[in-house]
């Protein structure tokens, strides 16, 4: 069995097109799991992983979304180990998705939006508020806009979002 299966997995994710931030998150999550369980991947059971998730949640007061993210990363890793024939069956198969509440995002009222617009000190700030309010794009997406991404005639922007995916707004 290869010395560092985690490195091979991360390389596979890189080839699949995962972003450097995603790969770093996978790496830190799986390194923590590996250190905590202190046993070869071939010997890790579903019970080991459940205990790990439970301990992680309790010790770190982690939320359900965080725990499900960890479970999802473990699932991806162990599915890869199974696909590559390093293990017979993924121990994550029997660990179900963690139910999480979907929280509705708070929307600015028309009155609050007007107050925000009135307090803009420059045309630049006003343009930022207006484009965010009218398109629903993320702040990070707005920051990443270039002049070439804006088509004033069509009143459209080409936005690069999460995962380097582009979409018109």
Each language-model region and where it sits:
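N-terminal core-binding DNA-recognition domain of tyrosine recombinases/integrases
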Residues: 3, 7-104
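Short aromatic/basic micro-patch
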Residues: 43, 107, 168
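Conserved tyrosine-mediated DNA breakage-rejoining catalytic core shared by Y-recombinases
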Residues: 135, 144-169
């Amino acid at each position: 069995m290869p010395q560092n299966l985690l490195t091979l997995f991360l390389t596979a994710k890189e080839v699949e097109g995962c972003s450097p931030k995603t790969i770093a998150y996978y790496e830190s999550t799986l390194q923590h799991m590996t250190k905590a369980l202190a046993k070869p991947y071939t010997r890790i059971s579903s019970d080991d992983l459940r205990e790990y998730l439970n301990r992680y949640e309790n010790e770190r007061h982690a939320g359900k979304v965080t725990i499900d993210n960890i479970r999802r990363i473990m699932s991806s890793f162990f599915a890869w180990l199974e696909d590559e024939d390093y293990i017979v069956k993924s121990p994550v198969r029997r660990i179900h998705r963690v139910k999480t509440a979907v929280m509705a995002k708070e929307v600015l009222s028309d009155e609050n939006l007007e107050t925000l617009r009135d307090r803009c000190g420059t045309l630049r700030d006003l343009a930022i508020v207006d484009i965010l309010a009218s398109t629903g794009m993320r702040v990070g997406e707005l920051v990443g806009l270039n002049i070439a991404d804006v088509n004033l005639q069509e009143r459209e922007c080409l936005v690069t979002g999460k995962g380097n995916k582009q979409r018109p707004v």
